[in-house]
Amino acid sequence: MAGHSKWANIQHRKGRQDAKRGKVFTKLIKEITVAARMGGGDPNFNPRLRLAVDKAKAENMPSENIDRAIKRGTGELDGVSYEEARYEGYGIGGAAVMVDCLTDNKTRTVADVRHAFSKNGGNMGTDGCVAFQFKHCGQLMFAPGTSEDALMEAALEAGAEDVVTNDDGSIEVITAPYEYSNVKDALEKASFRAEFGEVTMKPQNETELSGGDAERMQKLLDALESLDDVQEVYTSAVMDE
């Protein structure tokens, strides 16, 4: 990705997430509840729940909030029942966009997502229109200057699928979704702490945007991320600083 800094884009995305901390607890509670409902209440045997609980702890969510969310998911406590929904579409320059939601009213959610697309220069598409452009995987990002050879050896030994060194010197470790936590833990034991990590939908090809197009694309992403029912927004767009 000549002319673009993968590290800068990751940091920019993380900054956007940090700026929206007011919504973080709500989204995490939803994810914990759904993960527990689908896979059981023990994080040791439910990788999705373990990841959600780890995220919640990283955000300093009180343990009693986490426990209540798990119990709502397992049915031990009453609570709202959320459904998963995914919407796909196109942003500026044809950039692929995928929106993952947890909702108690799909009619409301699809209307809100469609409105955000159309109001901000995007176009909501049909199911499957862009999903094939993304790979479901774990991603751990290490800062430029990290020892490439040592990290690669430790990552592959821990079960990572791939290790990629970017043009800006940052290093990405790619894992299977269900191996993300195991690889992350193994690397931390080997003294490699990622600056950023998540289970994500990684674009297979990137759409480079700059200037006004990048600004318009950012506005679309912000509009989608601000919706109450939206959990994650993935895009193939890579924007200049």
Curated annotation (Swiss-Prot):
It comes from the Bacteria. Transmembrane segments: none annotated. It holds the Pfam family TACO1_YebC_N. One of its GO terms (cellular component) is cytosol. Keywords: Cytoplasm, DNA-binding, Transcription, Transcription regulation. The keyword Transcription regulation applies. It is found in: Cytoplasm. One of its GO terms (biological process) is regulation of DNA-templated transcription. InterPro entries: Integrase-like_N, TACO1_YebC-like_2nd/3rd_dom, TACO1_YebC_N, Transcrip_reg_TACO1-like, Transcrip_reg_TACO1-like_dom3, YebC-like. The keyword Cell division does not apply. Signal peptide: none annotated. Residues 1-21 are annotated as: Disordered. One of its GO terms (molecular function) is DNA binding. Belongs to the TACO1 family. This is Probable transcriptional regulatory protein AZOSEA20720. It comes from Aromatoleum aromaticum (strain DSM 19018 / LMG 30748 / EbN1).
